[in-house]
């Protein structure tokens, strides 16, 4: 599933497909005015019509919710949600729109997907814009994650300094999660590690406000 966003007088402009970060995150909704809404959208619409793709397994593109089958079956299903398959979906959409080339913007995981796109179908892209998602040269994954953890630690301290009451709130939530007393609307029990994963939004613009 993808939605097309354009200004009233911009329907003749070239296309830019946005490859969302994640993985596992749907594309942003242009009608939502929350702090996490992409600030670059207005600028992009000056030059392009924007294609917002819900990548496989997210949003309105057959979202992954309840696990189905045994572990091997689940693992096999997930092999169909990788960057290479997302690129094939992009190509299907490009052909459906009847265009020879379009530009692509890759954010975080979307940058890795864009790199795959450039490697596989360079003739389909007029331009590629990266805002993250490029592998470091000469550095191991452990080095990158160690640096990332330090950044998130600093972001967490900054968040609690800005919203001191949330430190107490999260401590209370962590205690409840440890007892198995927090559940999602679908009935899933929220464990402490899942609760802590909320902190990943602090790495995005407006993440502190969204988490608060």
Residue spans for each PLM region:
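Alpha/beta-hydrolase fold active-site neighborhood
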Residues: 180-212
């Amino acid at each position: 599933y993808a939605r097309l966003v354009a200004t009233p007088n911009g329907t003749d402009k070239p296309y830019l497909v946005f490859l969302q970060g994640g993985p596992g995150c749907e594309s942003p909704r242009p009608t939502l005015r929350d702090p996490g809404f992409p600030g670059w959208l207005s600028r992009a619409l000056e030059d392009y019509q924007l294609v917002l793709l819900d990548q496989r397994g997210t949003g309105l593109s057959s979202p992954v919710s309840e696990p189905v089958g045994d572990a091997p079956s689940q693992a096999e299903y997930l092999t169909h949600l990788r960057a290479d398959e997302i690129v094939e979906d992009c190509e299907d959409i490009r052909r459906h729109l009847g265009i020879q080339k379009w530009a692509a913007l890759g954010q975080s995981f979307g940058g890795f997907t864009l790199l795959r796109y450039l490697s596989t179908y360079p003739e389909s892209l007029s331009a590629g814009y990266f805002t993250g998602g490029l592998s470091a040269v000469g550095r191991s994954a452990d080095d990158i994650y160690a640096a990332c953890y330090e950044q998130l630690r600093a972001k967490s301290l900054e968040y609690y300094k800005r919203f001191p009451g949330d430190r107490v709130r999260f401590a209370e939530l962590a205690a409840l999660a440890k007892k198995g007393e927090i559940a999602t609307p679908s009935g899933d029990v929220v464990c402490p590690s899942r609760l802590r994963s909320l902190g990943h939004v602090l790495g995005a613009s407006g993440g502190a406000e969204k988490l608060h």
